[in-house]
A protein has these predicted regions:
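Conserved glycine-rich cofactor-binding loop
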Residues: 9, 16-18
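Short, small/polar-rich loop/turn modules that mediate ligand/substrate recognition or access, typified
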Residues: 84, 177, 182, 237-239, ...
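Substrate-binding pocket helix/loop in short-chain dehydrogenase/reductase
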Residues: 94, 100-102, 106-114, 196, ...
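Short C-terminal tail/terminal secondary-structure segment
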Residues: 99, 150, 209, 227, ...
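Catalytic Tyr-X3-Lys loop
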Residues: 103-122, 137, 141, 158, ...
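Active-site helix of classical SDR
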Residues: 125, 161, 169
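Alpha-helical segment proximal to the catalytic Tyr-Lys
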Residues: 130, 174-178, 235
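Residue(s) in the substrate-gating loop at a strand-loop-helix junction
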Residues: 145
């Protein structure tokens, strides 16, 4: 089967719902054992866990704050103790992303964006790399966003942090390539999930008009991109960004 992830173990942070859930489901359907991560919404995490198991997927869930190094280290140790390895890392956890003028942001909010999108992948990588280097194989796929490529106004904290995440991924791709570890990014467009339930309908309609393919993307679309990057078929692909946005950024 192409893109088979049989016997691989994957961790997706922020995977109780939304894009993270879609990524977790796609990895599981490709054969991976899936480790869910959540912080507050245990009910949603339990539902996703049960949905995975209903599909015959070997899955477990772990509570940890994606911005806390000690909790991340403990989670990775628990996963490796339970499954014996951790082959695929998908940093996906995200805080709220309010859109507002730069004068209305404060420094703490900027730091929070940086903590989630640069520091969290860095801390997770430090935790998983010893095992990946020992096995001479690993996949790190950061979930970024099209906002960096589109220069969205009034999103400066989010755009800056996502730009840092992409730059970090490119540097790590070169550093880790000799060890058989690839580092890539998936950059979704605006994909309506639970997070966007209260977004204005007129804004959604205007955005939809800008998608050349003419439909909304889904969490499954993002998950399929992650499955590709996780596979052996993508072993010669590293340091790249795949925009999953229906052709909005064809460059």
């Amino acid at each position: 089967m192409p893109f088979s992830l049989s016997n691989k173990v994957a961790l997706v942070t922020g995977s109780s719902r939304g894009l993270g859930r879609g990524v977790a489901m796609a990895l599981g359907k490709a054969g991976a054992k899936v480790c869910l991560n959540y912080l507050n919404n245990s009910e949603a995490a339990e539902k996703t866990l049960q949905d995975l198991r209903d599909e015959g997927i070997h899955a477990a869930m772990f509570r940890a704050d994606a911005s806390d190094q000690s909790q991340l280290n403990f989670m990775v140790e628990a996963i490796e103790d339970k499954f014996g390895s951790l082959d695929i890392l998908v940093p996906n956890a995200t805080p709220d992303q309010p859109q507002k003028p730069i004068e209305d942001y404060d420094a703490d909010f900027y730091r929070q964006m940086y903590d989630f999108f640069v520091m969290s992948p860095f801390m997770l990588a430090q935790a998983v790399l010893p095992g990946m280097k020992k096995r001479k194989r690993g996949r790190i796929i950061n979930i970024t966003s099209e906002v960096f490529h589109c220069s969205v106004p009034e999103f400066s904290a989010y755009v800056a942090a996502k730009g840092g995440q992409i730059g970090w991924s490119r540097s790590m791709a070169n550093e880790l390539a000799p060890f058989g570890i690839t580092v890539n990014t998936v950059a979704p467009g605006w994909i309506p999930t639970e997070r966007h339930e209260n977004d204005p309908e007129d804004a959604k309609n205007e955005y939809l008009k800008t998608i050349p393919i003419g439909r909304w993307g889904t969490p499954e679309d993002v998950g399929n991109a992650v499955v590709y990057y996780s596979s052996d078929e993508a072993s010669f692909v590293t340091g790249q960004t795949l925009c999953v946005n229906g052709g909005r950024t064809p460059w």
